[in-house]
Amino acid sequence: MKLHELKPAEGSRKERNRVGRGVATGNGKTSGRGHKGQKARSGGGVRPGFEGGQLPLFRRLPKRGFTNINRKEYAIVNLDQLNKFEDGTEVTPALLVESGVVKNEKSGIKILGNGSLDKKLTVKAHKFSASAAEAIDAKGGAHEVI
């Protein structure tokens, strides 16, 4: 096979369907929009959530709760994720982001006690669960709230 003999796989290249170009194409005249009506008009159509005049679902259901503008969301790191670091490492939020353990810091890092810790580490984070702090100290490491 030579370069000039290359062809795309069968069925992989499909020409787009041009509507309104004659009755013989199968998509002429009304261009697949049916006859008259709101959806046949240019720019026509109903807004999202519109149910034809029936009271829409979002208005039938009661309002509930509120959004706390002061809410802080912490990036969560479990103990077993800290095992990837060498013994004696100082684990900081910057190191966690750099090594890909967390994608971004959000409002801070919280260390939780899921899994087991096998290394002696100095961990600096914004929050610790009681079990996580206990496990870090039990291995001879240290935890520091920043």
Swiss-Prot record:
Query: What is a single Pfam family found in this protein's UniProt entry?
Result: Ribosomal_L27A
Looking at the UniProt record for this protein, which Gene Ontology cellular component terms does it annotate, in alphabetical order? cytosolic large ribosomal subunit
Q: Where is the composition biased (Gly residues)?
A: 42-52
Q: Name one GO biological process term.
A: translation
Bias regions of kind Basic and acidic residues — which residues?
Answer: 1-18
Lineage: superkingdom? Bacteria
Molecular function (GO) terms for this protein are: rRNA binding; structural constituent of ribosome
Keyword annotations for this protein, in alphabetical order, are: Ribonucleoprotein, Ribosomal protein, RNA-binding, rRNA-binding
- Presence of the UniProt keyword RNA-binding in the record: yes
Note the Gene3D superfamilies from the entry: 3.100.10.10
Task: Region Disordered: list its residue ranges.
Answer: 1-54
Membership in a protein family: Belongs to the universal ribosomal protein uL15 family.
Outline what the protein does: Binds to the 23S rRNA.
* Oligomer and partners: Part of the 50S ribosomal subunit.
> HAMAP family per the record?
Ribosomal_uL15
Q: What is this protein called?
A: Large ribosomal subunit protein uL15
Species annotation: Staphylococcus aureus (strain NCTC 8325 / PS 47)
